[in-house]
Regions:
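Small cysteine-rich, disulfide-bonded extracellular modules of the LU/uPAR three-finger superfamily
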Residues: 1-92, 99-139
């Protein structure tokens, strides 16, 4: 499973434009979405969101945990496990974003998690396991 932070997210975190008090969401997309970490900055840049029973456009709210790691000199952000019950969907990736509550062109992208292959639920529970992103590097 590969994860990457969008360049704009790293910039927003360091500038203080995004923090742990913000509202975050996770949306599911198909394998047809090709992320571009350099140019995709807003939710409106994301294509091929999944559709299906038990899934609402825009995804679900998540409450991440931000931890300063003074040993490895980085910020660790953990997004919790999310489930869609009684769902019939096929997803390849999860896209996390800061939600502003208006147009998708205002919502800042955080990171994308590629599952490596399609994950399918057929009238059951789709479970997205917790994901961690680390910003910074060892000294």
């Amino acid at each position: 499973m590969a994860s990457l932070a969008y360049d704009s997210y790293v910039d927003d975190v360091f500038k203080g434009n995004i923090d742990d008090a913000d509202t975050y969401y996770v949306m599911l997309v198909t394998s047809s979405y090709t992320e571009n970490r350099a140019t995709h900055t807003k939710r409106s840049d994301v294509t091929n969101e999944v559709t299906g029973t038990g899934y609402t456009s825009g995804g679900q709210a998540v409450v991440p945990t931000f931890t300063k790691d003074t040993t490895n000199h980085r910020l660790e952000i953990v997004f919790p496990t999310v489930t869609w019950t009684t769902s019939t969907i096929t997803a390849r990736k999860a896209v996390y974003y800061k939600r502003r509550g208006g147009a998708s062109s205002a919502d800042e992208l955080c990171f994308v998690n590629d599952f490596g292959s399609d994950v399918v639920s057929s009238g059951g529970t789709f479970t997205l396991n917790a994901s961690t992103i680390r910003i910074g590097s060892p000294a």
